[in-house]
Curated annotation (Swiss-Prot):
Keyword Membrane: yes
Annotated GO CC locations: membrane
A Pfam family assignment: AA_permease_2
Disulfide bonds: none
Keyword Membrane: yes
GO molecular function: transmembrane transporter activity
The organism's taxonomic lineage, starting at the top: Eukaryota, Fungi, Dikarya, Ascomycota, Pezizomycotina
Keywords: Glycoprotein, Membrane, Transmembrane, Transmembrane helix, Transport
Its job: Transmembrane transporter; part of the gene cluster that mediates the biosynthesis of swainsonine, a cytotoxic fungal alkaloid and a potential cancer therapy drug. Does not mediate the secretion of SW and the exact role of swnT in SW biosynthesis remains to be determined.
Similarity comment: family membership: Belongs to the amino acid-polyamine-organocation (APC) superfamily. Amino acid/choline transporter (ACT) (TC 2.A.3.4) family.
Membrane spanning stretches: 42-64, 79-99, 126-146, 167-187, 193-213, 272-292, 316-336, 370-390, 398-418, 436-456, 469-489
Protein name per UniProt: Swainsonine transporter swnT
Species: Arthroderma benhamiae (strain ATCC MYA-4681 / CBS 112371) (Trichophyton mentagrophytes)
Length: 498
């Protein structure tokens, strides 16, 4: 059944006329597809920050910045990415305030683009957004087992991790989080609870690191550049920003809750800006707690657990701090499942997928969620997991495109706004003419920089296991989306809800 002529009832329920396959061609029935708007600004922050997860993410990506310049890359890189994150959040806030819709980026493009290119650009943006969400979901699914098995390695140095172990846990997490995202009633409650757990866990880690550290990093060492990548310092710095960049990613999550939160034109921008405030505050404290207290460390392994063990001097303490980190990463996968499914559901309402009649359905009580979109997105994530089992290098290249695809999906509507002229844009309540323009330029400039330097290998002297295939994957994704457009979407894809 496909949704048609949606209208808002007095109680906030969305009622849609649908073509019924049971009652015969041409007949219509009325079904209730959504009964409430359960999210508040706080719960939207919870689910948005639950994916961004800045402080926890910094612990996971410590090893990516150390070879590119050491502490300065991590510290200054974090500040730079916080500025980019604020610019991105401001840009998205202006767009969602003007055009509140769960489709987010692709709806903005359809609304703003010249009529001749509207459908094609909108569809490309929709698919870019969804593939990015799938790639990021796969990354989160794998982060849990890979980092969980570091506990085993810490306790038993002879343990050898095998890819099949991560694959099994990957798929189990995918199934469990998909099921957990099925119930609309619990989503805002869980997101608020997880936000509290996140704040308490991060606070406990920071306090423990300062309390247990026996050595400290001198000011000289804190700002000493140690670049072993083989690249010039400037190039290495830009490549090394990748880790910090992930900690300010996925900011569009809250925008896809536009039909599940009252007054989305004002509440979602609040959620976006507060997400950046929380991310910056918690992330800065975590970075200082680690870099100030780590001191000299004589090991090539700069994984989060190793650093915690080095600072605390206790395996038990390190593991005790690492377990809540793993839980919060697991929780972020649950938030990503919600994000993926809302995107797939919204795109399906425009007949963007071959199975759109199923993906566009909202299941009745006790779910009130797009179950088929959840399952479809989870299957996409599962397929990424199968790729990991076949080739870790191919998997890493694929998920690495996630952040670049995100920026691409943000940049397309932003470029269109600038092309038309910001003064001509029918903006919403969240609108800052000069600040917004600066935010647009900063985000677009960084998108271009990231697109170039994130395609570089980490080390200048490349060995087969370290080849960066991101550029090749981006080309394949472009070919895939183009093929889908000409084979299916050009005929079927139509945006009917603006």
């Amino acid at each position: 059944m496909s949704l048609r002529n949606d209208e808002q009832t007095e109680k906030g329920a969305v009622v849609g006329k649908v073509d019924s396959q049971l009652s015969g061609p041409g007949q219509e029935e009325i079904i209730q597809v959504q009964t409430q708007k359960p999210f508040t600004t706080l719960s939207a922050i919870g689910i948005g920050y639950g994916v961004t997860n800045t402080a926890v993410g910094l612990l996971l990506v410590l090893g990516t910045g150390i070879p590119m310049g050491g502490s300065p890359v991590i510290f200054w890189g974090f500040l730079a990415m916080a500025a980019v994150g604020l610019a991105t959040a401001t840009t998205l806030s202006e767009l969602i305030s003007a055009i509140p819709h769960p489709g987010g980026q692709y709806i903005w493009v359809h609304k703003i683009a010249p009529e001749r290119y509207r459908r094609g650009l909108s569809y490309a943006t929709a698919m870019i957004s969804w593939i990015a969400a799938i790639a990021i979901g796969a990354s989160g699914n794998l982060a849990v087992p890979v980092n969980a098995f570091t506990i085993v390695t810490l306790l038993n140095p002879n343990f050898v991790y095998q890819r099949w172990m991560g694959f099994v846990v990957f798929q189990l997490i995918n199934i469990v989080t998909c099921f957990g995202a099925c119930f609309e009633y619990f989503l805002p409650k869980i997101s608020k609870a997880l936000l509290l757990v996140n704040v308490l866990s991060v606070s406990a880690i920071i306090i423990t690191l300062f309390a247990t550290a026996k050595t400290h990093t001198s000011a000289k060492d804190f700002f000493k550049v140690v670049n072993v990548s083989g690249w010039p310092n400037g190039v290495a710095f830009l490549i090394g920003l990748n880790g910090s960049n992930w900690c300010f990613s996925c900011l569009d999550v809250a925008t896809h809750l536009a039909e599940e939160i009252p007054s989305p034109s004002t509440n979602i921008p609040k959620a976006l800006i507060w997400t950046i405030v929380i991310a910056f505050s918690s992330g800065l404290l975590m970075i200082l707690a680690v870099l100030v207290n780590v001191g000299p460390i004589n090991t090539p392994d700069y994984s989060g657990l190793t650093v915690l063990h080095h600072i605390t001097g206790s395996k038990a303490a390190a593991i005790g701090l690492w377990v809540p980190v793993l839980f919060l990463v697991f929780a972020s996968v649950w938030s990503i499942q919600t994000w993926q499914s809302r995107l797939a559901w919204s795109i399906s309402r425009e007949s963007g997928f071959p199975l759109h009649r199923h993906f566009s359905k909202i299941f009745p009580a006790p779910f009130y969620t797009p179950i088929w979109s959840l399952i479809g997105s989870a299957i996409g994530t599962a397929l990424f997991g199968c790729l990991y089992l076949a080739s870790e290098l191919a998997f890493n290249s694929l998920i690495a495109t996630g952040i670049l695809l995100q920026y691409a999906s943000y940049s397309i509507p932003t470029i269109l706004v600038l092309y038309r002229g910001r003064s001509k844009f029918q903006h919403g309540p969240f609108w800052y003419p000069k600040l917004g323009f600066m935010a647009n330029i900063v985000m677009l400039a960084w998108t271009l920089v990231a697109l170039i330097f994130y395609c570089f290998p980490v080390y200048s002297e490349v060995i087969p296991s370290q080849v960066n295939y991101v550029s090749a994957v981006l080309i394949l994704i472009a070919i895939l989306i183009t093929s889908l457009w000409f084979l299916y979407a050009k005929k079927h894809y139509h945006v009917v809800e603006i």
